[in-house]
Amino acid sequence: MTELVHTRAELAAARDGLTGTVGVVMTMGALHSGHETLLRAARERADHVLVTIFVNPLQFGPDEDFNRYPRTLDVDLEICRRAGVAVVFAPVVTELYPEGKPRVWVAPGQLGEELEGQSRPGFFHGVLTVVLKLLHVTRPDLAFFGEKDYQQLTLVRRMVGDLDVPVEIVGVPTVREPDGLALSSRNRYLSPDERAAALSLSGALRAGAAAAAVGADAGAVLAAAHAAFESGPSGARLDYLVLTDSDLEPGPTAGPARMLVAAWVGTTRLIDNMSVQLAPYS
């Protein structure tokens, strides 16, 4: 049976009752099939799964969708129950931030100011701060994050390593609709026409990956992705489309690489990414 707790004291008591390994899945709610994949991965690796549901105000800018972000706790709880989750921690904002905002934040470093960090200033300060707080209060052995938010996953791994947080970070592959659209809680904002336009993101990534698969160099891979985005369904406005190495460093030439894209579709901002394998120069 899934136990729902709302305070840190209730969480501590519930956590103390879990023997064996504990895996945490941190969410903002509005759970979908992608989250269910995270829950299954956690069940496979850990004796118990703990889920956090918290719409973190620190990671929303003044013009972003904090108030509009979907909140579906009853539905989320049913998904967690079906998945065999042991504990769900769903605090109110003042439970984690009694003074409204923390006095100390986690600085993400240079990578946190690029890509999503450049388009959304302060975003990763808020993300890493809440992740670190939740790691402290949930005390997991493993923490599961989707590769869909690849920059976030990379920064969380760096934070855990640099700050000696005793937890294993596990990345879980992106879940997609049959037509390629990456699952996201924000997809529910899209109209039918916008839903079609959103395929420009995955279409660009697939074109780049296809070019890499036949031996194209980094420049040609990126050019193929840009061409596919521009020729794809109309209605998506590109923010960035880049090719990095697997650690998000610029200038990959061979081996594992990562292509990342962000675009506006109507009033909704979507992100996606895909791994590509660059052939060595002959």
Swiss-Prot record:
Pathway: Cofactor biosynthesis; (R)-pantothenate biosynthesis; (R)-pantothenate from (R)-pantoate and beta-alanine: step 1/1. Catalyzes the condensation of pantoate with beta-alanine in an ATP-dependent reaction via a pantoyl-adenylate intermediate. (R)-pantoate binds at Q59, Q152. It comes from the Bacteria. It comes from Salinispora arenicola (strain CNS-205). One of its GO terms (biological process) is pantothenate biosynthetic process. This is Pantothenate synthetase. PANTHER family: CYTIDYLATE KINASE/PANTOATE-BETA-ALANINE LIGASE, PANTOATE--BETA-ALANINE LIGASE. Keywords: ATP-binding, Cytoplasm, Ligase, Nucleotide-binding, Pantothenate biosynthesis.
